[in-house]
């Protein structure tokens, strides 16, 4: 399905170009397995030069919920991570404490979530530009903060959701997501947002084979389960 979808409001899908790179995960220039998370300071840039990073054999705990200490990279507010491959041996991929920028970050096999964004405020923006993720049985991008996430020219294959606004965070809020030029194959939802909290989603130039690329939920706060309540577009 080639689509341009916005919610709210919803636009009629049209055929447009998508630019997610479909040539597979780049060949790494080096491989590093680290026993601890790599922290990138606020406002700093970490350019991996196309090396692969992971946390060593057995790091993935089969969907056990982890925190930032289980991640491969932990980005403080305003930090940038670029030109890197996150290997399969990890429980969490990248955690952002506040808005961050990811440029050409690839995930060869997602364990729990590839990217988790938290503590961003309304009006702050996170950018995920290029790159892609494979084999994310649950979510690629988990958004727990209250800002806007922009996903541009991304590639996803074999996934549950490309983006999910947190369904049951203790402190809920309105979140926004913008997806453009992205390719999503063999998966579920491109975006899942909470209708009852006023979330917004815009999908432009997205190529996806999902029956319903944009899905509405009723979110909740705390120890509860959000409920699927409809679709942003047919």
Swiss-Prot record:
InterPro entries found in the cross-reference section: Pectate_lyase_PlyH/PlyE-like (IPR004898), Pectin_lyas_fold (IPR012334), Pectin_lyase_fold/virulence (IPR011050)
Cellular component terms (Gene Ontology): extracellular region
Cofactor binding: number and manner: Binds 1 Ca(2+) ion per subunit.
Class of the enzyme per the UniProt entry, highest EC level: lyase
Keywords carried by this UniProt record: Calcium, Carbohydrate metabolism, Cell wall biogenesis/degradation, Lyase, Polysaccharide degradation, Secreted, Signal
Catalytic activity, as annotated: Eliminative cleavage of (1->4)-alpha-D-galacturonan to give oligosaccharides with 4-deoxy-alpha-D-galact-4-enuronosyl groups at their non-reducing ends
Annotated localization: Secreted
One example GO MF annotation: pectate lyase activity
Its EC number(s): 4.2.2.2
Signal peptide: 1-17
Example of a GO biological process term: cell wall organization
Gene3D superfamilies given in the database record: Single-stranded right-handed beta-helix, Pectin lyase-like (2.160.20.10)
Chief localization: secreted
Superkingdom of the source species: Eukaryota
Pfam families with a match to the protein in the record: Pectate_lyase
Cofactor names: Ca(2+)
Role this protein plays: Pectinolytic enzyme consist of four classes of enzymes: pectin lyase, polygalacturonase, pectin methylesterase and rhamnogalacturonase. Among pectinolytic enzymes, pectin lyase is the most important in depolymerization of pectin, since it cleaves internal glycosidic bonds of highly methylated pectins. Favors pectate, the anion, over pectin, the methyl ester.
Annotated family: Belongs to the polysaccharide lyase 3 family.
Protein name: Probable pectate lyase F
Source organism of the structure: Neosartorya fischeri (strain ATCC 1020 / DSM 3700 / CBS 544.65 / FGSC A1164 / JCM 1740 / NRRL 181 / WB 181)
